């Protein structure tokens, strides 16, 4: 599916080009500046030549995006939920299983579905109860009034460790995100026990193998 909250990137390759030259993210001046920066690392030049042997300019901005996208596609997130859905009924606690039922009964599953629990559709923010947002969402891309406040539904994989939440980063806690989404999207005023139950389940979607990885030599040369 498309990338970014407003769907302005059609695939991972297009997405990978954005943050690098975005002035409020990585802030590189231009694609040429990216090529020059990476071209200053001898090992990168050799690796790109090996990865793209048919290209006269192996270390190009397009190929940088292709390489990043290829890496991103290797990022899978095995979780205890996956063990449970595959037949290991002890993988989730009774509390987490109740949380799944609450998640479904509250209506969350209508948008956050599939193996990724979202990430494959757009939805209007404030579908039932209006949500105050200065960001027009997909409308900024399409200029179609029907796309006003339409955003990509995010995946809930690793949601417990990827705060802040929402397109504007305005929500700091998972509990508050659950409470607000239930109200604005499906019109449910969840009580504290229901919010806590859903939160317990969502934590079971965290990748058990999340570890910090570090490059050994490249970072010091950048």
Which residues are covered by each model-predicted region?
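Periplasmic c-type cytochrome electron-transfer domains
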Residues: 1-222
């Amino acid at each position: 599916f498309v990338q970014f909250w407003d769907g302005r990137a059609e695939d991972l390759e297009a997405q990978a080009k954005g943050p690098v030259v975005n002035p409020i993210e990585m802030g590189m001046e231009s694609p040429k500046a990216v090529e020059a920066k990476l071209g200053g690392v001898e090992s990168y030049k050799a690796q790109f030549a090996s990865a793209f042997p048919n290209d006269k300019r192996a270390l190009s901005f397009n190929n940088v995006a292709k390489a990043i996208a290829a890496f991103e596609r290797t990022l899978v997130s095995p979780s205890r939920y996956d063990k449970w859905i595959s037949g290991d009924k002890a993988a989730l606690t009774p509390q987490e299983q109740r949380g799944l039922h609450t998640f479904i009964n509250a209506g969350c599953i209508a948008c956050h579905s599939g193996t990724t629990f979202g990430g494959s559709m757009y939805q209007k923010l404030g579908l039932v109860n209006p949500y105050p947002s200065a960001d027009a969402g997909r409308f900024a891309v399409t200029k179609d009034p029907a796309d006003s406040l339409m955003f990509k539904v995010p995946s809930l994989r690793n949601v417990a460790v990827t705060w802040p939440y929402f397109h504007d980063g305005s929500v700091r806690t998972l509990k508050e995100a659950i409470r607000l989404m239930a109200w604005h999207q499906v019109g449910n005023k969840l009580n504290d026990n229901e919010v806590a139950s859903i939160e317990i389940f969502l934590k079971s979607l965290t990748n058990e193998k999340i570890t910090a990885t570090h490059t050994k030599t490249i970072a010091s040369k950048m």
